[in-house]
């Protein structure tokens, strides 16, 4: 007899689709995965929305013009503006008009040659630069049109402030793109691609010289990329200044054809006490330029009037002497090195300034604000270069500095206005002269130049006391953030000082050399050199500040002091020599090559190294910077700083330096070449180390580290992680438990009885099965399956306490039954291998009582033996009618066709056509033909030899639905009609129909059991005893956007049970509380801000994600629903049937980083619901420690929090009568009796209250703690009271419970407001008004629970008091959470018994209201609210654009400084636009057909 052929032997024969399953080869068991049963358009909708928003963002970035920004700038206060906008708001950036003749003359020269324009300060050198830039840009545009390489102009300055100032000037005078860069923008971290972008989009770049120099060194920019170099204050080009290095290292090394044009600007080419002519020639040589000045000086004089130059003589100064205060400080603290410079200045000031000024320096040098820097200096000094054995602990020195501060605080300074003898003759003369100018209201503006910063500060303070009411002094000194003695100043403060001077708010500026050059300070009519100019440049530049007609430039000169007189005369004569030299220079002169060679004389002993492929250059001086950047790149987040160490030693008349790199560097360092100077030795060592790093591939071809520094976790912008971007991670598909003893033939087995408890009567009988395993399984919770017509049935998994011994025969019987289940029911034939079986199945003995029977007796051995003995049930036509009823029948050749029989239908014969109730198949000739799944020859032979007289059996086809964990889809609800079959083409299974019916549910059951086991494995990794139910809930993610609670769920996975959302909501709150308690206990001296920053680092998603990845929690997350291929046991070889395809990715899943972090919070939430022996939060505390993985939270149970806490001194200090009275009053009101009344005092002390009076900290620390504790109490209440609400609802309604508005009303109702200690008149009136409003609201409304929602917002201090009080009782009670709960139950809970009254309050938020409007009122699901930072906008800060997009159309937009407020604005704008719009009109305008689509889906 010919062997029957399988259908898939004939691939060319087409298959007609039928409703029983998709069209496929007959071997198929119809188990193709439908991974995304949802709307297939959802991903494309999301992509379209993202694309639409990106287009909008790009468009808006261009539309937000300079005019928009100017409007914002105008409306913003000066002290709130950024540096660039602060300068833009002033007239620094005014448009320059009408060049004068001498400016045009110099411009024409600059067009032809490299020149250094020498003109007085204020004579318009910048205009010449603007004219030249416009000319160069015109040429550049022509060159670009001829497809020549792009080139850019660089305007170089010597200070950061000038970057902003000159950029503002150029932006207002040049109609091409101008950008500005300085080191503060972290330009040293930019790579070549970044610079390429800037060069491509800008015509002019204004930057500090160091920025360009570093670029040239790294070859990110080359001389051939530059068409013009402008050197502002060109006299700085000397020695190793970046101006000089740019020219020497790059400009002169390039060929003439590649060199850019050079234009220098200076008031004087001489910046030192040296021969004027020689200095000028050196500058010309160095800048490869010719000095040029106005040929007609009279024209220049007419444009820039010269001031009247005067000498103010003063009597001879006294010798430096020790004042009484100086003596006292010197005798007690003269050995403190941290105060050494102050002592030196004070002594000199006694002569130069007078006794009062000599003492006054201490008044600000030892203030509370200045002490930290002095203390830091003391600590560094103590730990400095001393050997370890001699290191002195700095605490004593710091304490002595504080003692000095106390002396100053109590010192009585004399009144210099009453006692002029306290001032030096020099200061008295200055005072005498200034009084003349400021004796009445005047427009006079004066700058007094001093040599030292302290002098400027002291004179400013002095003249604020002894000046007239019309003299308004101010101070302008150089930027130094590291200065001690109260003299640290930022760029911002410097610019604000200039702004005040420009506005006339200050009219007498005491300034150091910073006011001499560069900064655009308005014209003055009085300039005083309090300290004489030391160089010609100083002289000319400071004099140039006096530009008004009839202005005065005065030198303060000591009477009969030849040195002073000669100094002034020398400067005046030097200026004349310099001018004659400039005018007499021949026009056709060229630079002497010997002069150029002389430039490199100092560099002859310094090597350099150039990378030929890129042109990047390493020099002695640049090697220090390169090495510092390399070390910095080794730093990883919060690890210790990676600093290069340099160690010097002196041997054989030379210095030798050794470099030691940080520990993580693959190369530790090298010893440099001997050198005569310490600095050169250091540079040599750095240079040689860089070469070694380059040799080992640790520096690339641009001398940039091949490592990349991880930015600090502290940076808030980096704490958030993406909730959209997904990565592929390994996913556990089978629990580890199955593998532990696989491969070994067991001698005993454990039992789990599987059964159903239906909610309604089932139509079919289901015979329970027994799951047999090698290892004892844990107790599993009940979970639902949906059988037949979506009848919900609870699956009960009863784990039997004791196992039973099995023989080899028993195992053979059990293995046969289990494999027969896979073969007959699921069309899978496995290789028989008892040792590799994961588990076994057996029918339950229905006559046994589970609770009392022996384990072995629970198995129905009769059915097991029958199946073992009979591979199938034979039949014949002579069998009785009863034989044909209630059988399980299957098609051995086609896995789609399985039936339960009902009995014989005598009205039909095999040769009759199939009734119309049966789905169409390929062969519809007759019933016999319909039931046969063979092809051609085999089919023909079978039909020739079959019994055509056999009965026709009425049967029910079994649906191929496997995922019984969820209700049927619309497609699955299609009712199948009756089927009529012949048995000869089919096989009657030996498995009883009731057992088979239950077995069809087994894939869903075992899938959920395996999910429980995998979830428990994750908990075991963390050593957390979480129950299976909570563990699985915490690890279940059932859609791509699970966290977007009310958005349409993308790729929703059906039948997965509860997802992690609610547990995450609870865990997030507990995490906040736990870390707050730990930080509070461990850091008693930290302020609230420190707490917030540290907590932010602990609870941020980035930190949780990092820990989760370390534990590989991603593998345990359940992100995929029931798998038709994945539920089968592993270990066995599949011989027949479809297995998991080779290309399947079921062991991988895509997870967003935020999802992994959210799961951590969900696990913590799960632990909150577990009972513990001692404290109910013990396991949750342990979970937090495991998942934050930080020393800042390292406790294993609740009780350990209190052990961390070191009681601060103030808490146990002696309690005074007022504090006892306060505690008694509060006990009467609230019922809590404080052990430490100081804590209560602290809780009610406002930050404005002076600490010297309070003697306790203000409430901010306790408020930080109380806020987290109250959050937890509220969240627990709302979580348990509303088990069916999603996290969005919970969050919105929790906001009401912890809102400042509610807590403010609580403070008043409990009478706490009267106990607040504060020092603010305005606050008092605010509290009074608010209390009156609350009392009025109570009278009017009758005091309903939500009366507080109708009042205005309270002063912030009132809710802070409540939270601080909660923190205080928590600490006072020894870290008892119960007292917090008691407070909640007693005073807060009554307001929230009915949360529905707060629905309106929650929905008032514009974003929530917009969602409800679109989703509920309009029935739209294709909408989104997106936000993103607007790129390249130089506004007053970060600019974020938010947009509401409906069906690809932008409905509304909002721009703000943060995403939160931008979304708020966009939502409000969208609501305004949608107001009054009927649904039909909405659908017309936006083309919305969502409701129609939903209707169609519902009717499928």
Curated annotation (Swiss-Prot):
GO biological process: defense response to virus; regulation of defense response to virus; siRNA processing
SUPFAM superfamilies registered for this protein in UniProt: dsRNA-binding domain-like, P-loop containing nucleoside triphosphate hydrolases, RNase III domain-like
Feature type site, description Important for activity: 1356
Binding of Mg(2+), residues: 1263, 1360, 1363
Residues the entry annotates as binding ATP: 119-126
InterPro entries, per database record: Dicer_dimer_sf (IPR038248), Dicer_dimerisation_dom (IPR005034), DSRM_2 (IPR056755), Helicase/UvrB_N (IPR006935), Helicase_ATP-bd (IPR014001), Helicase_C-like (IPR001650), P-loop_NTPase (IPR027417), PAZ_dom (IPR003100)
Domain RNase III: 1061-1172, 1223-1374
Entry's EC annotation: 3.1.26.-, 3.6.4.-
One Pfam family per UniProt: DSRM_2
Keyword Nucleotide-binding carried by entry: yes
Cellular-component GO terms for this entry: cytoplasm; nucleus
Stretch list, region Disordered: 1-47
Domain Dicer dsRNA-binding fold, residue spans: 623-713
Every DRBM domain range: 1408-1476
Biological function: Dicer-like endonuclease involved in cleaving double-stranded RNA in the RNA interference (RNAi) pathway. Produces 21 to 25 bp dsRNAs (siRNAs) which target the selective destruction of homologous RNAs leading to sequence-specific suppression of gene expression, called post-transcriptional gene silencing (PTGS). Part of a broad host defense response against viral infection and transposons.
Protein name: Dicer-like protein 1
Gene that encodes it: DCL1
